[in-house]
């Protein structure tokens, strides 16, 4: 259906909505009953109106584009490849594979998948620079987050020095790294805390990269050679905050 039905209804002011709600409350206090305070310290109202946006100067009329992504655990290349093709046939626009070990063949995993039109994300459950260097296509995003692994497991993959050596080699080859923000969400951080931890997490990497002359990465470039960061963010249970 392409025809909008909103024009068939008269506009209702925020004041009229609130009066209707107060009538339905039958004497109960509006603020005590319906307004709640979020973990971020925001008083959340039971409804919002376009009038609430009039005093906000930084709203935008459009949103950034996004792709439907299917996550597949790649224990077996053939089975995972079959699942990937099925997901793409059902509307998936990008694929995220969780890779359990370095013996897995990326070529077999991605067989007959159009890598020029389908973004591919690989989450490695191990750390190996040579595995990354042998990836068949530059458009593949390999999520490398040694700090994230330390936070999640309490341990480095090997040790601090070896992990950073692998990290340096991977970043030099791909010009990319990732920040797994989902760990903070899953351990109870609110949205403000997640943003703060994600920025601090990213800053640790940027400081390291800036101080590692062998990487020779220049900041501030806006071309294909610019350093790219992939943020993996979990979706929480607060519907209104998630869609904002």
Show which residues each predicted segment covers:
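Active-site loop/helix belt of alpha/beta enzymes
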Residues: 244
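Catalytic alpha/beta active-site cores
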Residues: 1-241
């Amino acid at each position: 259906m392409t025809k909008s039905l909103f024009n068939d209804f008269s506009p209702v002011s925020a004041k009229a909505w609130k009066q209707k709600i107060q009538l339905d409350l039958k004497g109960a206090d509006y603020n005590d009953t319906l307004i709640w305070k979020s973990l971020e310290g925001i008083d959340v109202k039971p409804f919002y109106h376009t009038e609430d946006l009039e005093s906000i100067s930084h709203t935008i009329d459009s949103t950034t584009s996004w792709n439907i992504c299917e996550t597949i655990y790649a224990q077996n290349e053939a089975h995972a490849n079959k699942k990937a093709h099925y997901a793409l046939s059902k509307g998936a626009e990008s694929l995220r594979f969780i890779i359990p070990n370095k013996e897995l063949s990326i070529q077999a995993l991605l067989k007959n998948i159009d890598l020029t039109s389908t973004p591919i994300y690989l989450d490695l459950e191990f750390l190996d620079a040579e595995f990354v260097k042998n990836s068949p296509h530059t458009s593949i995003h390999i999520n490398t987050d040694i700090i994230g692994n330390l936070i999640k497991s309490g341990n480095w993959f090997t040790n601090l020095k070896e992990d950073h050596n692998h990290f340096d080699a991977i970043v030099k080859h791909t010009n990319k790294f990732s920040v797994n923000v989902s760990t903070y969400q899953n351990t109870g951080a609110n949205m403000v805390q997640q943003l703060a931890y994600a920025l601090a997490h990213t800053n640790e990497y940027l400081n390291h990269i800036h101080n590692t002359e062998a990487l020779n990465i220049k900041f501030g470039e806006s071309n294909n050679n610019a350093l790219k960061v992939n943020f993996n963010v979990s979706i929480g249970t607060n519907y209104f905050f998630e869609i904002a």
